[in-house]
Amino acid sequence: MEVNKILDKLGIEALNAMQQDAYETIVRHNNDVVVLSPTGTGKTLAYLLPVAELVDGTSDDLQVVVVVPGRELALQSQTVMTNMGSGLRSMACYGGRPTMDEHRQLRQVCPQVVFGTPGRLNDHFDKGNLDTSKVKILVIDEFDKCLEMGFRNEMEQLVAKFPNLKKRILLSATNAEEIPHFVNAKTKETLDYLVEEPCERINIYKVESKEKDKLGTLRQLLLSFKDESTIVFLNYRDSVERTAAFLTENGFSVSAFHGGLDQKEREAALYRFSNGSACVLVSTDLGSRGLDIPNIANIVHYHIPETQENYTHRIGRTARWDKEGRAFFILSQGEYIPEYVEGEIEDYVPEEAPDAKPSKPRMATLYLGKGKKDKISKGDIVGFLCKKAELDKDDIGRIDVKDYYCYVAVNRLKMMKVLQKTKGEKIKGIRTIWEEVKK
């Protein structure tokens, strides 16, 4: 499939310099390739475009294994592959759901490309659920994270399973890790697009909190943002829950995101935030890596990042591509901005408005209890909502169709009407659940 046609499908006008360089190097050279480029520069597409060209679409064999450090990146990368419209079959494998369910799905899909976490991939290969003999391309995305303590042994076991590898592609947003010998990348081409200077498109501010508990200051700060898309970063799961509860009680549309949530809860939180149903995502540093959500205007460091690397990945969520962004440090007495934060830092004083109300997002998220396995498509959902709930097409936003359920963004002001009109109705002859996702 031509690159221009894929870009049209993705709504991208042209590749950036890093993506063009990666595409040409991976396709035209036999060497292994290491791509170093900041967060938010499109590394997923940088390797998927050439991979799609190198895979034999006429063969049912598994030919490409993409290793990622977490389930969110596995799911998002597989979604990009699907949206490219290359016709290649792909699947994401990750922990948090039964291996047997994935095994059944693998037999149905017969993927040519698999995205997965190291432990789950090892499990499938060890049980013979996937064949290693025809795998010719190994991709390790965020290889610095994959090779950290706890992943290293699993990675070494995994890499040793592929006897016929022709190419290794490693990608990272940092240059902190040496590539271990077991990866066996002997003749490698390194594309280094890391920039030492801080991103000039991110403006950095400090916000003084008079109280040690910063929640009141956070409220005033978020009120000043109106309905701008914002991620608030904290260092601990219980702090995320407490902060999200406070903001919800104060009328903000909030999603909470951390590793203590189950997979479906995490998916719902991300869908609400990415489709515009929640203006604020309150997250641990789990949300600083691998999430590809465009148009995030503000990053708020409620807690100071524990490491420079965490800081780099946090601010990488904003100012993506050619857009601008803002980062805010909320500081109580005795707290200081770390020395590694470079660039001009301005004071920001949000207006005190105790009676002000948060802006409400235009959209809300609707949950549908059926999905791909029930032959439900985006077109079916749009047609059903326009006919049964009397919505206009402009009232319907992003639709995400999963195997067994769907998320649909609809006009928030019409959500009650939708729930009333769809109650007891069948879609494609199937009775199902329709309900609003509120967190």
Annotate the PLM regions.
Residues 1-36:
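Conserved pre-motif I regulatory segment
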Residues 2-5, 59-126, 134-137, 242-257, ...:
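Conserved nucleic-acid-binding Ia/Ib motif block in the N-terminal RecA-like helicase ATPase lobe
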Residues 20-29, 44-59, 80-84:
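Walker A/P-loop NTP-binding motif
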Residues 130-196, 341-342:
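Post-DEXD/H (motif II) to motif III coupling segment of the RecA-like Helicase ATP-binding lobe
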Residues 134, 289-304, 326-330:
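A short beta-strand element within the Helicase C-terminal
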Residues 201-246:
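Conserved interdomain hinge at the start of the Helicase C-terminal
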Residues 280, 307-311, 315-348:
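Conserved segment of the helicase C-terminal RecA-like domain
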Residues 351-439:
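Non-catalytic terminal extensions of ATP-dependent helicases
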